Swiss-Prot record:
Residue span(s) of domain Globin: 3-151
Broad EC category: oxidoreductase
Top-rank taxon: Eukaryota
GO cellular component terms listed in the entry, alphabetical order: cytosol; mitochondrial matrix
Protein name according to UniProt: Neuroglobin-1
Intracellular or extracellular location(s): Cytoplasm, Cytosol; Mitochondrion matrix
EC assignment: 1.7.-.-
Catalytic activity: Fe(III)-heme b-[protein] + nitric oxide + H2O = Fe(II)-heme b-[protein] + nitrite + 2 H(+)
Length: 159
């Protein structure tokens, strides 16, 4: 598993400190962008028949619970920056779950773009090129583990 530099860890921790206190609104920004970039992903959220539009989905209690869980995964990664390898089994399992519900690995990249978009919107002037790169590096590590779990759960498909 790749490692982050001390400077990258510091940038991630400091930026997450303010965002992590109020996770759901930031997660909603991230998922709004995700559905903008890849509208077909909306079909994976079958919580109820009212999840036909992006806005319906984003305001659904079940979906907001999912947003909270995703933000908690990010929180766990930030909390374990010094030893991300300890999350390996958890992330492998998460990849398996995503494969089982029909998420393809290409969507992981779109989630990464959406995460960076949320950071840019939420941090404003605090969103710098080094900060972006630090988050991208962390996300790449997390997704690599999830992708290994995804591939272990079934035939490796890319579409």
């Amino acid at each position: 598993m790749e490692k982050l530099t001390e400077k990258e860890k510091e940038l991630i921790r400091v930026s997450w400190e303010s965002l992590g206190k109020d996770k759901v609104p930031h997660g909603v920004i991230m998922f709004s962008r995700l559905f903008e970039l890849e509208p077909a992903l909306l079909n994976l959220f079958h919580y109820n028949t009212n999840c036909g539009t992006i806005q319906d989905c984003l305001s659904s209690p079940e979906f907001l619970d999912h947003v909270t869980k995703v933000m908690l995964v990010i929180d766990a990664a930030v909390s374990h920056l010094d030893n991300l390898h300890t999350l390996e089994d958890f992330l492998l399992n998460l990849g398996k779950k995503h494969q089982a519900v029909g998420v393809n690995t290409q969507s992981f990249a779109v989630v990464g773009e959406s995460l960076l978009y949320m950071l840019q919107c939420s941090l404003g002037q605090g969103y710098t090129a080094p900060l972006r790169q630090a988050w991208l590096n962390m996300y790449t590590i997390v997704v690599a583990a999830m992708s290994r779990g995804w591939a272990k759960n079934g035939e490796h498909k890319t579409d």
